[in-house]
């Protein structure tokens, strides 16, 4: 006999019974559920079976699907579709026109996540961010990382040593000689200004490697850029090599992670060519948006 399913909406906080279904990054919702969030829980025979959470984006007419989870034994029974449909209905009632979601998966399009989302009416997910990760021991094994050096007329300096004049010149170049997604000053309060590097050539800044603590032992290679006139001469990989050697010598971080926006096609190709090792893990943050 099929279990009767009840769907409940929650405000204030998620019930502790749903803790096993809450993703790690949303654990705070068990204590306080933000007022701009909608949470639906599916219950059967007194047990939590599924959970869906969406977050409205401020004054925008869009929302992010933050979680849609169904317990393993209850999958493929329509619970996920039911939660998704009810969540979308509530969002429409609140004037929301778009719902977007993203998930981390393999570099291949066919996946359970993609199939489920498409069955719920979402377009086929597209790459949003390419992600590479591994240990610094792997970087030590890559021949070019160890051997490649910058010529003498190039100078690598800590990002925090940029002069006021250089900072102004870089800021002026945003949208001109480098795209906004490679802005080295974006979320500057989060970056490691001591380990992040700037590349100077004949008294002009022509590139940077921005680093950010990602975890206690993991360092994020957040943004790498070299001016187009210097890209064909291998200065980008040389800058990456210099940053890696410094961090390996220091020994504080064990692992690294590299994010590259899918729009940055040149950098994606660069990483695929240069950071190639059987123990380097490659994933993609897939994104899709549905009109309500």
Q: What are these regions, as identified by a protein language model?
A:
Residues 1-35, 143-181:
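Short amphipathic alpha-helix that is part of the acyltransferase structural core
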Residues 1-59, 266-280, 284-287:
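Hydrophobic, helix-prone linear segments
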Residues 23-39, 43-44, 49-62, 66-68, ...:
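A conserved beta-strand-loop-helix scaffold within acyl/acetyltransferase catalytic domains
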Residues 70, 76-93, 226, 232-245, ...:
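Conserved acetyl-CoA-binding loop-helix of GNAT-fold acetyltransferases
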Residues 81, 93-97, 105-127, 262-281:
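Conserved active-site alpha-helix within GNAT-family acetyltransferase domains
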Residues 91-106, 247-260:
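Conserved GNAT acetyl-CoA-binding A-motif
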Residues 129-162, 274-292:
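C-terminal "cap" of GNAT-fold acetyltransferases
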Residues 231-292:
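C-terminal structured domain segments across diverse proteins
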